[in-house]
Design a protein with these regions (language model features):
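Histidine-centered nuclease catalytic patch
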Residues: 68-126, 140, 147
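A boundary/linker detector
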Residues: 1-54, 60, 67-73, 170, ...
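Short cysteine-rich clusters marking metal-coordination/redox-active sites
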Residues: 63-66, 130-133
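A contiguous, mid-protein "functional segment" used to position or interact
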Residues: 138-169
Length: 194
């Protein structure tokens, strides 16, 4: 990243030099040729809970950028329902009203190559990560921020506490009155979790 950023900085230095000498057209040509504006396309992205869960399971409920274990969203919601003061939830995850575990431990889908940068919006370009990592990565490519993609987890191991979730919902069916828990329970029923 260093050399590329340095060379881009030097392109802008050349542009400023042209400004100083009154050569606005030259400055424009330098930018167009050496560091052109390329707008990021904001393509709509959407996946179903079932598609997301399939990716979470494929990745072993592990963050593919850090390797840290993540927790099934339905399980986080059960904890919040049982301990609302100690583990509060906010539907928009407001950090002053919601336990930070939702940001650190709830899995989400990230596009390895951002859709806005030419990546596909399908499972070949989707990986599991936390909301913290997803927000930090934003529309950057991995090499631009010095990250790498960890391999998929194979075999039985961490299940993101999905086993606990299934046992708890079976033991306490009224949990399904919560829309979020019901949504994730339906997705879990549709796939086999290792």
């Amino acid at each position: 990243m260093g050399d590329t950023t340095k060379s881009k900085a030097h392109v802008l230095a050349d542009v400023c030099s042209r400004f100083a000498s009154g050569a606005l057209d030259d400055a424009s040509q330098i930018l167009r040729k050496q560091y052109p504006f390329v707008p990021f396309e904001n393509a709509g992205r959407k996946w179903t809970p079932l598609q997301a869960l399939s990716i979470f399971v494929r990745d072993g409920f592990s963050d593919r950028y850090s390797g840290l274990p993540l927790v099934f969203p339905g399980t986080l919601r059960i904890i919040s329902l049982r301990l609302p003061v100690d583990f509060p939830f906010h539907r928009n995850w407001k950090t002053d009203e919601c336990h930070f575990a939702y940001w650190e431990l709830a899995p989400t889908i990230d596009h390895v190559i951002p859709v806005s940068r030419g990546g596909t919006d399908d499972e070949t370009n989707w990986v599991t990560t936390s909301m913290v990592k997803n927000a930090a990565k934003a529309n950057f490519r991995l090499e631009e921020i010095g990250w790498s993609l960890l391999p998929e987890i194979t075999g039985a191991g961490w299940d993101g506490l999905t086993s606990y979730f299934l046992d708890e919902v079976a033991r306490t069916p009224d949990l399904l009155s919560d829309a979020s828990i019901r949504k994730w329970a339906n997705a879990l029923q549709a796939i086999t979790v290792p």
